[in-house]
Amino acid sequence: MFSACPLRTRALDEQLLDTLKSLGVVASIADLNRQMARQRTYYWCMKNRGYSLHIGSLAFLVAKLSSELNASSCIRTRAKLRSAIAAINETIQAKCEIRELEFLGQ
């Protein structure tokens, strides 16, 4: 189900977590896991096993935040959510590019 990812893919997870924390979208790793509808230990288990966060989990988080964005009328909240969604989408894109290079053997 999961393939071992290079260190730079796991570094993307850490950068994303820092970005989401700075935006105030998540308060902790446990909060990130909850928002992705995963168990509390999902992030740490994946990291300790040498994997990165699953793209499907990140896509679920984008869908959830998009729903919150559509329901919100607060300009600041909407800006924060748009920034978070953009950061997650950039992470997904970067992971896909890295995975593509792995398939090509580079």
Name these PLM-found stretches:
Residues 1-2, 106:
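Intrinsically disordered, low-complexity and often Lys/Arg-enriched segments
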Residues 2-24:
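A short, Lys/Arg-rich alpha-helix, primarily the initiator
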Residues 13-16, 58, 81:
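Short amphipathic alpha-helical segments that mediate assembly, nucleic-acid/protein binding
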Residues 26-28:
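Residue-level signal for the short linker/turn that defines the boundary of a DNA-recognition helix
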Residues 32-33:
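Short alpha-helical "recognition helix" segments of helix-turn-helix
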Residues 37-54:
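Recognition helix of helix-turn-helix/homeodomain-like DNA-binding domains
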Residues 56-73:
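DNA major-groove recognition helix of helix-turn-helix/homeodomain DNA-binding modules
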Residues 74-106:
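Helix-turn-helix/homeodomain-like alpha-helical modules used for DNA recognition
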